[in-house]
Design a protein with these regions (language model features):
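ATP-dependent adenylation/nucleotidyltransferase module used to activate substrates
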Residues: 1-146
Length: 146
C-alpha cells in the first residue's frame, strides 16, 4: 500500500486512475451512485477512455430522479455501466421477516439491510466528499475497501 501511496502522490486524479489501471489491469472498477462527485469521476473515466469498469447498485430504494439521471448519463456518454441488484431470495426473506423499513429500527437491522442490498468490487473508487456526512478526519485520497 505504501508503494501505491508513494506512486500516486502528486498525480492528478486522471493520472492516478491511469496508474491504478496499469498496476491492476482489468481489476479497477468505479461504483457510482450518480451523485455530483460520481458524475465528475465517470466523466473523467469516459472522456479519457480509461479502462475502468463503471457500475452502480440498484438497492431497490433509489429515487425516481436517480433512474432518470442513469438514463440521461447513458444517453449522453454512450458508455456502458453495469447495474447490480440485491440477491432476490435474500431480499425477499428480509422483507418477509422484518418488513420494508427494518433498517430504521436498529443499527443491526441497518447493517443487515446494507449487507443484503449492496455489492463490493475488487478495487473500488467511490466518489466521496471529505466534508459532508459523518466526520472523516482520516479520509484518504485512496484506500482499500475491505
Amino acid at each position: 500500500m505504501t508503494d501505491i501511496k508513494t506512486a500516486l502522490a502528486g498525480l492528478s486524479e486522471t493520472a492516478a486512475i491511469q496508474y491504478l489501471t496499469e498496476q491492476f489491469p482489468g481489476a479497477v472498477a468505479f461504483s457510482t451512485s450518480f451523485g455530483q462527485e460520481d458524475q465528475v469521476l465517470a466523466d473523467m473515466i469516459w472522456r479519457n477512455k480509461l479502462p475502468v469498469r463503471v457500475f452502480t447498485l440498484d438497492t431497490g430504494r433509489l429515487f425516481q430522479e436517480t433512474y432518470e439521471l442513469m438514463d440521461l448519463t447513458r444517453a449522453r456518454y454512450k458508455q456502458p455501466f453495469e447495474t447490480y441488484f440485491p440477491e432476490t431470495a435474500a431480499m425477499e426473506k428480509l422483507v418477509a421477516e422484518k418488513g420494508f423499513n427494518s433498517f430504521y429500527d436498529s443499527v443491526e437491522n441497518r447493517k443487515e439491510c446494507c449487507f443484503i442490498r449492496k455489492r463490493q468490487a475488487h478495487r473500488m473508487a467511490p466518489g466521496r466528499r471529505m466534508e459532508p456526512g459523518q466526520p472523516r478526519p482520516a479520509f484518504r485520497r485512496r484506500q482499500r475497501e475491505v
